[in-house]
């Protein structure tokens, strides 16, 4: 794997960008690294089912049964599983890992609700109808790491035919979404579901987006309300409305490249952003100036000119277990 995000113990706070500059060649070691980074590394860290039971599943029934409890467990998905159904509820202390690129859930998604300490890695989730929920939904939960997933639908239908790809709502906290391929969708990723939910969401919704490849997206790449976001080392290709900061959200946007976007970074209803070393590809940054200049963990930046070569072909479901 050819991206980087330096991992630091969860107790660090207020660090400047002291980590060494990343190189494309240095990114390969992360493929086998099981430690969460970004906001998911804080608040005690995110270890998923490490140290628990191990199960391999290849059917909808077996998958649903395997992931539901709160006991420590690692659930490997072998091959595709297709089922038109509501989201499968995922228990705490769970790692869901696709064994290779054939591990794709089609027609149903995952719901992490009122849970903690969950890892979802190397998994495909696609074409989940709106009536069945998001591809990956995180609600009222903390310490969730979504890494190397491939989430998509299509844009052949209207914008309400599918729901979100990765939505973080209802005061969820300490979430990292990394190294993922997020593509072919109308409304991709939402942090904070409603302008009217500030009382619940304020002080929560801390989310890191790192090393992601966004492609053929209409909007919400991502959209953030009330919370705190850090978006870095990501490549945005043909994303109409990119990063939307709104309703008091504070977002730090660094080392990203945009190609074919009309609105790369913008505010709605007093959302704020600080941006550094971003190539907006001719699109405008119209976001209000924010105050988030540091985050309480260490990380390394590729530089906007190197993001495409490091992320495209590496982000997504590219690992093997």
UniProtKB/Swiss-Prot annotation:
The keyword Cell wall biogenesis/degradation applies. Glycans are attached at residues 93, 238. GO terms for molecular function: metal ion binding; pectate lyase activity. Residues 1-18 form the signal peptide. Its EC number is 4.2.2.2. Ca(2+) binds at residues 134, 163, 167. This is Probable pectate lyase A. It comes from Aspergillus fumigatus (strain CBS 144.89 / FGSC A1163 / CEA10) (Neosartorya fumigata).
């Amino acid at each position: 794997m050819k991206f980087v995000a330096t991992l630091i113990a969860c107790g660090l706070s207020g660090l400047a960008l002291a980590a060494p500059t990343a190189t494309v060649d240095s990114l390969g070691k992360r493929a086998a690294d099981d430690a969460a980074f970004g906001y998911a590394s804080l608040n005690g860290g995110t270890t998923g089912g490490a140290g628990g039971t191990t199960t391999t599943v290849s059917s909808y029934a077996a998958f649903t049964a395997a992931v539901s409890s709160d006991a420590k467990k690692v659930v490997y998905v072998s091959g595709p599983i297709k089922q038109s159904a509501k989201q499968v509820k995922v228990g705490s202390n769970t790692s869901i890992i696709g064994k290779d690129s054939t591990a794709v859930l089609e027609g149903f998604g995952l719901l992490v609700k009122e849970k903690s300490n969950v890892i979802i890695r190397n998994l495909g989730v696609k074409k989940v109808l709106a009536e069945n929920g998001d591809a990956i939904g995180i609600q009222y939960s903390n310490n969730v790491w979504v890494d190397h997933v491939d989430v998509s639908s299509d844009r052949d239908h209207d914008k309400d035919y599918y729901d979100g790809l990765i939505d973080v709502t209802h005061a969820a906290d300490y979430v990292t979404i990394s190294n993922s391929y997020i593509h072919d969708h109308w409304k991709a990723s939402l942090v904070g579901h409603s302008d009217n939910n500030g009382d619940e969401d304020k002080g929560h919704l801390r989310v890191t987006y790192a090393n992601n490849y966004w492609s053929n997206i209409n909007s919400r790449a991502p959209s953030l309300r009330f919370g705190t976001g850090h978006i870095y080392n990501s490549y945005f290709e043909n994303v109409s409305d990119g990063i939307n900061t709104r309703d008091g959200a504070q977002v730090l946007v660094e080392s990203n490249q945009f190609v074919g976007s009309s609105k790369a970074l913008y505010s709605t209803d007093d959302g704020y952003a600080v941006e550094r070393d971003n190539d907006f590809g001719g699109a405008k940054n119209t976001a209000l100036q924010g105050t988030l200049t540091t985050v309480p963990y260490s990380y390394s930046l590729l530089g906007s000119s190197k993001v495409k070569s490091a992320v495209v072909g590496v982000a997504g479901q590219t690992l093997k277990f």
